[in-house]
Amino acid sequence: MSVLFINGSPNKKGNTARLASELLDGRAYETLDLVDYKLYSYGQKFDDDQFDEIVSRMKAADIIVVGSPVYWHNMCGSVRNLLDRFYGPIRSGELSGRKFVFLFQGAAPEPWMLEKAEYTMSRFARMYGMEYVGMASNSGEARAIAQKLG
């Protein structure tokens, strides 16, 4: 089973990556650090844009884990930008058959932040046909979701 962790944090070995390693403990997985990719804003068109490469890696995975630190009471810009870019070029249901997990970690995310993030990510997963397994914001939640992944 192929697992892809998309790390939205600019800190490749930070707390978001740590939470992913706790979730995926014992599983082989690939990491895609968004900070290493040229992912332009929705509506911009440049020859060196790597959106298609990111989508291709997502299509090759059976399990997709997206991780974001909490920045300004919300998910980080790189993850938000990735979601925005899906609108239009990617058809509804195009990622069906995959499992999707969201990691959202920060020093002290408030309940309303977690609710908004989970709403957005669960809708994203369903729109593109993925099974939304859940969201983890701490180690205990990550371990519980790991059990659901089997």
What do these predicted ranges mean?
Residues 1-91, 122, 126-150:
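N-terminal beta1-alpha1-beta2 submodule of the flavodoxin-like/Rossmannoid cofactor-binding fold
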Residues 96-135:
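Short, glycine-/small-residue-rich phosphate/pyrophosphate-handling segment
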